[in-house]
Curated annotation (Swiss-Prot):
Keywords: Acetylation, Cell cycle, Cell division, Coiled coil, Cytoplasm, Cytoskeleton, Microtubule, Mitosis, Phosphoprotein. GO terms for cellular component: centrosome; cytoplasm; HAUS complex; mitotic spindle microtubule; spindle pole. The modification N-acetylalanine is found at residue 2. The gene is Haus8. Residues 130-204 form a coiled coil. It comes from Mus musculus (Mouse). This is HAUS augmin-like complex subunit 8.
């Protein structure tokens, strides 16, 4: 234990003797001091190794074993240097001052692991930077893709809303146009029906005009005959007006002549005049004549009254007989007209033939069906 403590003290003294304070380079008159580059390199390597120790190793990689090897080398450096030692001499090594040699060896051994450590740290830092850059790029690309998808989704939503609004407007406009077209169609249909009705009416008027023209052409030669017929008809009417008071006398059969009838009616007329005079209806001159006639013949009034009664009874009987005779005559005339019509029909059918008569009595379709093919 005493030997190891003395050895450590010697090493520290040698290290203190070898250590040179770090001074900045400055210009001195007459000479120039150049610092040792070996010490500067050692310091830089130590700084780089310390920075590499602070950095964390990337995931999936094992921590470097350089510090452990360095410690082992330091331990081995402080141990025995002789490999052929006898038993018992390992505990009491020779008392040699190897501090300078150990310091050089340790500094060299420490420099090489630091270099390896810095290279590995640089490589790992480069790899980690590349991975971080790739991850950042991927994240950036993913974010850009998500932003683009969100913008496209928003645009699609806006387009769908616009399409729905435009579709609603188009539907409303189409409904209005359809209603207007329906109204226009109804108006045109009414106009077409009105024009068709007017056309049919004009066609009927034209047909009637053509028929009237044909009738006028056919009847124009008969106009003189019509004028002559009018004149003859007027003459017949005037003749009937002048002779109508004598017509019943020709149709009624009476016994005796007209003079005898007048002689029979003269007393009745006188009584009528007298009665009218009493009622102050007849003139006084006629009443005086009737009274004079009655004064000359005192029994004439009673005779006239009897005659009037008999005339009344006779007229009543004749009236009944005339009514009965008139009904019989009407019946006979109807039968005679029937017989005459049947005879004329038979004669006409014989003259015209069966086909023409069938057209008069039956419809044309029935005649076509019954006609021989």
């Amino acid at each position: 234990m005493a030997d190891s403590s003395e050895r450590d003290a010697g090493k520290s003294a040698a290290a203190g003797a070898c250590a040179v304070p770090k001074t900045k380079g400055r210009r001195v008159q007459g000479r120039r001091v150049v610092e040792s580059r070996y010490l500067q390199y050692d310091k830089k390597a130590k700084k780089v190794s310390g920075a590499a120790k602070e950095e964390k190793p990337p995931e999936g990689r094992k921590a470097s074993t350089v510090p452990r090897s360095r410690e082992e080398s330091q331990v081995m450096g402080t141990g025995n240097l002789q490999s052929t030692m006898l038993e018992g001499h390992g505990m009491n090594p020779p008392d040699l001052d190897l501090s300078a040699i150990d310091d050089k060896i340790l500094s060299r051994k420490a420099s090489w692991p630091d270099r390896e450590m810095t290279d590995k740290a640089k490589s790992t830092s480069f790899i980690s930077c590349d991975k971080k850059r790739i991850l950042r790029k991927k994240r950036r690309d993913l974010q850009e893709t998500m932003d683009m998808m969100e913008s496209q989704t928003l645009l699609m939503t806006l387009l769908s809303v616009k399409m729905e609004n435009n579709l609603a407007l188009l539907e409303e406009r189409a409904e209005k146009d359809l209603a207007a077209m329906c109204h226009e169609k109804e108006r045109l249909q009414r106009q077409a029906l009105e024009l068709r009705r007017q056309l049919l009416l004009r066609q009927k008027h034209q047909e009637l005009a053509a028929t009237l023209d044909a009738q006028i052409e056919v009847l124009s030669p008969l106009q003189p005959v019509l004028e002559r017929f009018k004149e003859e008809y007027m003459t017949l009417g005037r003749a009937l007006d002048t002779t109508r008071h004598e017509l019943p006398m020709q149709a009624v059969h009476m016994e005796g002549s007209g003079q005898e009838l007048l002689d029979d009616l003269e007393p009745a007329l006188r009584i009528t005049l007298q009665l009218l005079g009493d009622l102050s209806i007849c003139s006084p001159y006629a009443t005086a004549q009737v009274q004079g006639a009655s004064a000359q013949e005192p029994g004439a009034s009673t005779q006239l009254s009897c005659l009037l009664k008999e005339l009344k009874g006779l007229v009543t009987e004749k009236d009944l007989e005339l009514r009965r005779l008139v009904s019989q005559v009407v019946e006979l005339s109807s039968q005679a007209s029937k017989e005459a019509a049947l005879m004329n029909q038979e004669v006409w059918e014989e003259a015209e033939g069966a086909l023409t008569s069938s057209q008069w009595y039956f419809s044309p379709d029935a005649c076509r069906d019954d006609s021989p093919s």
